[in-house]
């Protein structure tokens, strides 16, 4: 909501008026290991559908799309492509790492070590409680972080805004600047299809290779 308010303020300060629409997002990490993962792509498509429905049922001149995680970022990209309006994506940033660069990615390894008796239950509990120390997308180059980079590489985010730490104060200013910039894009009539071209896809593919991005992307 902080970023929504900042984006709205940027729109207001540039002479526009925005409207807020929300949709829910599931966590692929929590959904793994049981039937919940079968909802992953379905919920991505539902988010994209709702973006299309809200966008086309109302006379918007542009859109700021806020998402951070595995399927919500691609859902926004799919939705804004269908709308083909002036569009900017901003993200909620990336989670801080835990002690000794501990991340959620390592919990599976520690779980196996606990089952083999190589670490104590106490140590395993410590890892679980400290792997996700803040809000934000998972702090490793998984699908969420990769998709943030891909959105910027495609030209749909402000330069330098992908992978900013979720606890970084600059993120608020980035959201505000996105609100101001969407007004400029709307005045120019610069649509998503004017930015996302074959060349921008080729650029994103090269960037993906350069960062060793998630193959899920």
What are these model-predicted stretches?
Residues 2-42:
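Anionic-ligand anchoring segments at beta-strand to alpha-helix junctions in alpha/beta enzyme folds, i.e.
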Residues 40-203:
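Active-site cavity-forming subdomains of large catalytic enzyme subunits
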Residues 212:
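Active-site-proximal helix/loop microenvironment
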Residues 205-207:
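Flexible, glycine-rich loop/tail regions that form catalytic "lids" or insertion modules at the edges
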């Amino acid at each position: 909501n902080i970023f929504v308010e900042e984006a709205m303020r940027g729109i207001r300060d540039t002479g526009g008026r925005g409207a807020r629409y929300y949709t829910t997002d599931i966590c692929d990490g929590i959904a793994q290991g049981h039937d919940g993962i079968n909802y992953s792509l379905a919920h991505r498509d539902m988010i994209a559908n709702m973006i299309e429905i809200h966008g086309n049922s109302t006379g918007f001149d542009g859109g700021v799309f806020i998402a951070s995680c595995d399927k919500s970022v691609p859902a926004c990209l799919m939705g804004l492509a269908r709308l083909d309006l002036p569009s900017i994506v901003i993200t909620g940033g990336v989670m801080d790492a835990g002690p000794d660069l501990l991340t959620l990615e390592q919990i599976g390894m520690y779980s196996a070590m606990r089952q083999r008796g190589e670490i104590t239950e106490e140590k395993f509990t410590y890892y679980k409680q400290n792997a996700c120390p803040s809000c934000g997308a998972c702090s490793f180059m998984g699908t969420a972080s990769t998709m943030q980079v891909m959105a910027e590489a495609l030209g749909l985010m402000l330069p330098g805004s992908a992978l900013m730490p979720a606890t970084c104060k600059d993120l608020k200013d980035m959201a505000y600047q996105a609100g101001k910039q969407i007004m400029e894009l709307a005045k120019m009539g610069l649509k998503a299809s004017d930015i996302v071209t074959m060349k921008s896809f080729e650029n994103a593919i090269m960037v993906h290779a350069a960062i060793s991005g998630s193959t899920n992307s």
